[in-house]
Amino acid sequence: GSHLGIVMHPQGDAVVTAMQDNDLHGWRLADGHNMRMSGYPTKVRSMAFTRDGKWLVTSGADVVVMWSFTGSGPMGKPPVELPGSGGALCTRVACHPTQDVVAAGFADGSVLMIDIETRRVLPVSLNQGGAITALAYSPDGCMLGFGTEEGLIGAVTLASE
């Protein structure tokens, strides 16, 4: 199938692509080993590795889906699911550049920040105008920006601690 998106592992260990068929395909670059990650109800349109490369965080379900890239990688391991937004489809994800925190945007316009270890959720924006279509942290991690399909944009200043 055709590729919808691509993400590189931060240490250069792997490359992962989102496919037309609601799957992810990855390759370990050292040996070319093929990895398939499936089970999504819809196409994955957004994915990002955590800063340390331990997790691949993805949209495409009503929760935030994370695949482990420790040890031998995601094959044979179930994904970890982080909380969602009341059944709304996760449309965008972004990984914090210095902390183990994921930002996730949803089809209902909500933006959540989720601590990977504790699973604590911080609502950033709830039910704004349309699905979240853009989401990014600033390079220093002190701001989070988002945009919706209806043209709303937002930028939130985050505490430095």
Per-segment meaning from a language model:
Residues G1-E161:
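WD40-repeat beta-propeller superdomains and closely related acidic/aromatic-rich repeat-like regions
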